[in-house]
Amino acid sequence: MSLNAETKAAIVAEYAQSEGDTGSPEVQVALLTASINHLQGHFANHKHDHHSRRGLLRMVSSRRKLLDYLKGKNLARYQDLIKRLGLRR
């Protein structure tokens, strides 16, 4: 199950660099993080759902690539995003 439109709109509004920004790495990483967190809750009840687990691993990999890109482009934005999302505990 994916995120609903209201949740996505709230995440986009919070992490967007400018009005109407949906493609910046910050927004993409925030949306992926929300989906990953949602799926982790799903796996608490459905341990043997291997098809969804593959999707989860794909999202984690995609998020890692976007974070690596952002880290190479602008370290300050990367560190701010990591802190805001609570990653790298």
UniProtKB/Swiss-Prot annotation:
Annotated keywords: Ribonucleoprotein, Ribosomal protein, RNA-binding, rRNA-binding
UniProt cross-references to SUPFAM superfamilies, sorted A to Z: S15/NS1 RNA-binding domain
Cellular component terms per the entry's GO annotation: cytosolic small ribosomal subunit
BP-aspect Gene Ontology terms: translation
Function: One of the primary rRNA binding proteins, it binds directly to 16S rRNA where it helps nucleate assembly of the platform of the 30S subunit by binding and bridging several RNA helices of the 16S rRNA. Forms an intersubunit bridge (bridge B4) with the 23S rRNA of the 50S subunit in the ribosome.
GO molecular function term, any single one: structural constituent of ribosome
Name recorded for this polypeptide: Small ribosomal subunit protein uS15
Pfam family, one: Ribosomal_S15
Source organism: Aliivibrio fischeri (strain ATCC 700601 / ES114)
Keyword rRNA-binding: yes
SMART domains hit by this protein: Ribosomal_S15 (SM01387)
Keyword Thylakoid applies: no
Assembly with partners or alone: Part of the 30S ribosomal subunit. Forms a bridge to the 50S subunit in the 70S ribosome, contacting the 23S rRNA.
InterPro entries: Ribosomal_uS15 (IPR000589), Ribosomal_uS15_bac-type (IPR005290), uS15_NS1_RNA-bd_sf (IPR009068)
Similarity remark: Belongs to the universal ribosomal protein uS15 family.
